[in-house]
Amino acid sequence: MTDTNVNIIRLTAAEIAAKVASGELTAVQVTEAHLARIDAVDEKVHAFLHVDREGALAQARAVDEKRERGEKLGPLAGVPLALKDIFTTEGIPTTVGSKILEGWIPPYDATLTKKLKAADVVILGKTNMDEFAMGSSTENSAYGPTGNPWDLSRIPGGSGGGSSAALASFEAPLAIGTDTGGSIRQPAAVTGTVGVKPTYGAVSRYGMVAFSSSLDQGGPCARTVLDAALLHEVIAGHDPLDSTSIDAPVPPVVEAARNGSVEGMRVGVVKQFRGEGYQAGVLQRFDESVALLKELGAEIVELDCPSFDLALSAYYLIAPSECSSNLARFDGLRYGVRVGDDGTRSAEEVTALTREAGFGDEVKRRIMLGTYALSSGYYDAYYGSAQKVRTLITRDFEKSFEQVDVIVSPTTPTTAFPIGERADDPMAMYLADLCTIPTNLAGNAAMSLPCGLAPEDNLPVGLQIIAPALKDDRLYKVGAAVEAAFVEKWGHPLIEEAPSL
């Protein structure tokens, strides 16, 4: 790579947008630099499933032409982005990391995809993910695992590991993820990047392939808090095409990110978010973050949320139940792969053969779990009980937010584990989402940002900030203050310590 390209890929999204708007850089230059980076390192990282070289350069040229004509540019015009392969993209494959949709090219754009294009963001391609967003390591992708740029033998988190790895390897300054139980935040934590799960319903799900409809939420991924806020503002907003979309103004997230402060804020620490299964180095960095918040003028309040201990169990009944219903549409008859259709078999047989060949083990496991939990005679004992626990978790959050403005916790109990280490132990894998799942069940907003490297393995640790529903701006206000204090303490952003690959 040329020195110019190296300099370009190291810029933040905000810096790129400013340089493109002023004419110091062209959008084509920026896009070419990132495509060159993908060519140089993605064979090792495997962040992308599909790179849309021609489409990205065409979008970039359109931005440059718009600028030459003196037309107004969007706040992220010309900034490249890596899109999780769960959002439909007209004319570009959308696989959701599954064999069952191999080669499927959607005839329409998701609302989120449309918003990105309307904002002049340059979509580089589609990123790898756990199949149908089910997993915490991106090992469940039908197209092979993604490596963590900090150590390629380790996982980049999941389900959105391709998006977080693209950021940490400087293949893109922005990415999109989705978060059902932690799939934006946990990858951000283990790759030293920033990930935000907005309030449920804040970002349209139209054109996003559904896993668990009452939990799924798209959101921004970036390397800085301000970049995440700029992307959040672009993708959020009411959409009449999504029945769960919130008809409320987007909170002032960019303003909050530009004015970070915790002075006088009450910050809650939940006693349930530590103990067995937490790596010592993760807790050490978390405790240092709490001390830092105190130094910055926050009041620390201890919270007790007993229902959080049941969150994981409730989640693994609710999410599979909704998945078993949502994934019934993948029958091999309407779109995607079709197996065994030789003219001798019935539609039922073709569907059974297609699903057997098309779905991976984890997806089959969750479909079976969910079908069982919803079956006659078991519904109240399983799905019904889990929904009651969900109500208790929501109440614990409501009680907590009467006493505090935000809650902080470790994002995930450990740093990135080696690829393959938990592949045969679903329960160990599920524990990666211990701290993130309660937020999905309650529908409020949360962010993960880097808070240092764990002393044991020199790998990134994430700090999670949780805010009440529709108060997403608090995440950015606190996140920006913490980020600035850490950068001052370290002398540089943490991501600069990542290997150059």
Curated annotation (Swiss-Prot):
Claim: Protein biosynthesis is one of the keywords in the record: yes
Bilayer-spanning residue ranges: none
Active site (catalytic residues): 84, 159, 183
Keywords, ordered alphabetically: ATP-binding, Ligase, Nucleotide-binding, Protein biosynthesis
GO biological process entries: translation
Catalytic activity: L-glutamyl-tRNA(Gln) + L-glutamine + ATP + H2O = L-glutaminyl-tRNA(Gln) + L-glutamate + ADP + phosphate + H(+)
Gene Ontology MF terms in the entry: ATP binding; glutaminyl-tRNA synthase (glutamine-hydrolyzing) activity
Main EC class the enzyme belongs to: ligase
InterPro entries: Amidase, Amidase_CS, Amidase_dom, AS_sf, GatA
SUPFAM superfamilies listed in its UniProt record: Amidase signature (AS) enzymes
EC number(s) stated in the UniProt entry for this protein: 6.3.5.7
GO cellular component terms, A-Z: glutamyl-tRNA(Gln) amidotransferase complex
Assembly description: Heterotrimer of A, B and C subunits.
Sequence similarity: Belongs to the amidase family. GatA subfamily.
Role played: Allows the formation of correctly charged Gln-tRNA(Gln) through the transamidation of misacylated Glu-tRNA(Gln) in organisms which lack glutaminyl-tRNA synthetase. The reaction takes place in the presence of glutamine and ATP through an activated gamma-phospho-Glu-tRNA(Gln).
Descriptive protein name: Glutamyl-tRNA(Gln) amidotransferase subunit A
Organism of origin: Streptomyces avermitilis (strain ATCC 31267 / DSM 46492 / JCM 5070 / NBRC 14893 / NCIMB 12804 / NRRL 8165 / MA-4680)
Originating gene: gatA
